Amino acid sequence: AKGVAKDVGSVPDAISQAIQLTGVDTSWGPYMKLLLQAESGGNPMARNPIWVNYRTGQQASGGRPGPGWYQATGLYQMMEPTFRSYAAPGHDDIYNPLDNTIASINYIKSRYGHPANIPRLGQPGYRGY
């Protein structure tokens, strides 16, 4: 999903605030900007039209097929269960730029260590993180 954030100023602020709140190095900033452009185009309200079964990875379009199916949502296109697992206390709104950025940073730390390690980020063939 591509779009433009309704409050463009809030997105860079969210990145710098999330970096401070999570304690990661400022070197994360450019990568987080690159990642949000690839994932949502900077639109905190973005929702991928494809439903994904969180357990099997199976995909479907149209309406929600049933329990356990989610859409990638928000700036960093997180699935709801992943967002909940990595959200910070008090930052539980998947559509809030700061909350989504914090959860994304926490997920990236856990899975990749640093966003520089996300395969093909910023290159042709990038397929999501």
Outline where the language-model segments fall.
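Intrinsically disordered, low-complexity extracellular "stalk/linker" tracts enriched in Gly/Pro/Ser/Thr
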Residues: A1-V8
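Peptidoglycan cell-wall recognition and remodeling modules
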Residues: V8-Y129
